[in-house]
């Protein structure tokens, strides 16, 4: 069944501005600017007034209508990113061989050494706009921060996947670097 018209709106808070042109959305806030390209989805995106964006689909089937809510969720994540940012805290877990984590290239590359006693050095490059720091308050903790939740979570996933245990029983060998907490950079009430 096709609905004639389906839409959803996103209201932007005070201090956050946006522009829409050819389904490319730019959101600007106190922490910076994020740009997302939605040209692969066939739907209308139009500005209503100063602070509202309407996403509309005409004669859509079920999957196309689901994409409306997905686009609105992405835009809300962009708003959250330019206002409060995203922070993922990761902890190294090891049983015998301590995992050594260092940062290279101005906190743009994470180097992992001595994983399961191996001599190989694992290097994980971070996406643009994402920085990593080693926590001084907590032992064996890496903090990954940025404005775009997709890039921050992708960086955390790459770090976690680089320490995947191969050819051993994963119930016994639990060593690795895992996400322990997902928060925002600016504390919210």
Swiss-Prot record:
InterPro entries: Ribosomal_uL6-like (IPR000702), Ribosomal_uL6-like_a/b-dom_sf (IPR036789), Ribosomal_uL6_a/b-dom (IPR020040), Ribosomal_uL6_CS2 (IPR002359). One of its GO terms (molecular function) is rRNA binding. GO terms for cellular component: cytosolic large ribosomal subunit. Gene3D superfamilies: Ribosomal protein L6, alpha-beta domain (3.90.930.12). The keyword DNA damage does not apply. GO terms for biological process: cytoplasmic translation; determination of adult lifespan. Pfam families: Ribosomal_L6 (PF00347). The keyword Transmembrane helix does not apply. Belongs to the universal ribosomal protein uL6 family. This is Large ribosomal subunit protein uL6. It comes from Caenorhabditis elegans. The lineage of its organism: Eukaryota, Metazoa, Ecdysozoa, Nematoda, Chromadorea. The gene is rpl-9.
């Amino acid at each position: 069944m096709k609905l004639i018209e389906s839409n959803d709106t996103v209201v932007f808070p005070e201090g956050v501005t946006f522009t829409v042109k050819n389904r490319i959305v730019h959101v600007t806030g106190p922490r910076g600017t994020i740009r997302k390209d939605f040209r692969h989805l066939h739907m209308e995106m139009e500005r209503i007034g100063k602070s509202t964006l309407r996403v509309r689909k005409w004669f859509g089937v079920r999957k196309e209508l689901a994409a409306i809510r997905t686009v609105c969720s992405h835009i809300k994540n962009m708003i959250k990113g330019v206002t409060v940012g995203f922070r993922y805290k990761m902890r190294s877990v090891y049983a015998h061989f301590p995992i050594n984590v260092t940062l290279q290239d101005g906190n743009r590359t994470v180097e992992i050494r001595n994983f399961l006693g191996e001599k190989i050095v694992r290097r994980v490059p971070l996406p643009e706009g994402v920085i990593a720091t080693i926590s001084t308050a907590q032992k064996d903790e890496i903090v990954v921060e940025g404005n775009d939740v997709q890039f921050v979570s992708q960086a955390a996933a790459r770090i976690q996947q680089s320490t995947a245990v191969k050819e051993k029983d994963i119930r016994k060998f639990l060593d690795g670097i895992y996400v322990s907490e997902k928060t925002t950079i600016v504390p919210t009430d």
